[in-house]
Amino acid sequence: TQWIEMPPEMNRAGHLFARKEGTGKKLLLIGHLDTVFESDDDFQAFTRTGNIATGPGISDMKDGNAVIIYALKALQHIGVLDDMSVTVAFTGDEEMTGKPLSISRKDLIEAGKWADITLGFEGAITSEGSDWATIARRSSSGWTLKVTGRQAHSSGVFSDRVGAGAINEAARILNTFYEEVRGDYGLTFNAGTIQGGTVVNYDAT
């Protein structure tokens, strides 16, 4: 078992890796330790009532981490873990990956190349009373949209000379993206942040 520290300038937690050599297929089991809650968020307390636990990161993804650990315990209990080749990777920066990726993802990439079979243990879903396993994950891409307009008095907006303005044009483009992709299976589009304009009413005095 190894704690892999990240450089201080990356401002990201390290990773916890556990490796066991054996024969047969090489398994990589992936989880992550971080969650989206800020340290000063009101939702910080871990509580356990019977077999129900609540707290930050329980479903994303302490539950999956627990599944990994107890699955390995079960395999050990029945005597089949002894000869298995397994690597468990608990990353510390899944929610916001450290940069550069050549450092933050180095060990995970190497483990992925080593493995014959890789399983991620993020929570799946329950639909219509049945449990579902996730057999694939979507990738993502990020874009920056920059729109410029002609500075003019608001009374001229929508005229041929002035146009709709940069903010209206940005909204039109974003809505066009939304109209194009909504309904496509597995495809989503989200405008994360938007900023525009300077002041509502400018007084030269």
Language-model features: locations:
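Hydrophobic/aromatic beta-strand patches that form the interior of the parallel beta-sheet core
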Residues: 2, 27-29, 89, 117-119, ...
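Fold-independent oxyanion-binding glycine-rich loops
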Residues: 4-6, 31-33, 91-93, 121-124, ...
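Broad gene-expression machinery/nucleic-acid interaction feature
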Residues: 15, 85, 116, 140-144, ...
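Alpha-helical metal-binding/catalytic segments enriched in His/Glu/Asp
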Residues: 29, 48-99, 141-147, 156-180
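Acidic/histidine-rich catalytic neighborhood of metal-dependent amide-processing enzymes
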Residues: 61-136, 196-201
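Acidic-enriched catalytic cores of C-N bond-cleaving enzymes acting on peptides and small amides
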Residues: 135, 155-205
